[in-house]
Amino acid sequence: DVHIGNTSCLKDQPLPLTRLTVDDPTVAMRFSISNSPFSGREGKIVQSSKIRERLIKETLRNVAIQMEETESRDVFLVKGRGEFQMAILIETMRREGFELTVGRPEVIYKYKDGERLEPIEHLYIDCDEAFMGIVTEKLSARKGQMANMINHGSGRVRLEFTIPARALIGYRDEFLTDTKGTGILNTYFEGYDSYRGDFPSRFTGSIVSDRQGQAVAYALFNLEPRGQLFIEPGDPVYEGMVFGEHNRANDINANPCKEMKHSNMRASGRDENVILSPVKPMTLERAIHFIREDEMVEVTPRSIRLRKAVLSAQGRYRQRPRD
């Protein structure tokens, strides 16, 4: 067998080259079969055995990817160097016809002398001076520590931070929004350091469908004041599917299929067309960054849906933490 880093040489001159080393993975995600009500509708490869074979094949040709089997035969733990590397693998699999469910990226901790250590990234940022305040504020809230600041005198500033790798999950899109697309962000792996403390993965809740059906414009119009919606009229939904971002920190169950009641009464000004706000398409990267620990992304060749890990509202109620 030949492995990455091996040297092929003559028998009488066995002089191996310096072996190549690959950085240890810092992020892990759970890949599993889809158990949603729409399972098998859009994907042609849904079996756990096929998903396992595909992941093993990926580890053989991509040395930065590792795969471990879990206590469940339908769930696989995939490790890599970052959430974008994971997103590339998932996107490749969906284009090959796979249908699967993935969880939120989780950092891989190490323990030394009983102390928990976490991966730390060195973060380089180049942005306009006008955005320095909001960038610094948000990175500080994510346990980032400023290491250096250089003002070029040209209206742009360079910032350097050391920050936990988990804090960068979902931050890149937010950074581009805060800097109006003009900011530049780069990172490199610095090493492991002491755990810097907890912080919320997201400051908003989810709007969760309480039934299966098709979304109706009337229902979505009435739900718009509650937050940003991810679906349009006519899109299929099911119980436990996340179809919007709640303005507040808590989750709410809602009915996106509710139709307007018809009656013989006709009132002036009640028949206007319903006008909905534009829906921002849910990309794979955005979905992976958006979900929380109790949520998952359902990936098919045609759709990307957000859902709760426990679809039943009663099941989620029973599992909620008790005070």
Feature-to-residue mapping (PLM):
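Accessory interaction regions appended to the cores of large information-processing enzymes
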Residues: 1-323
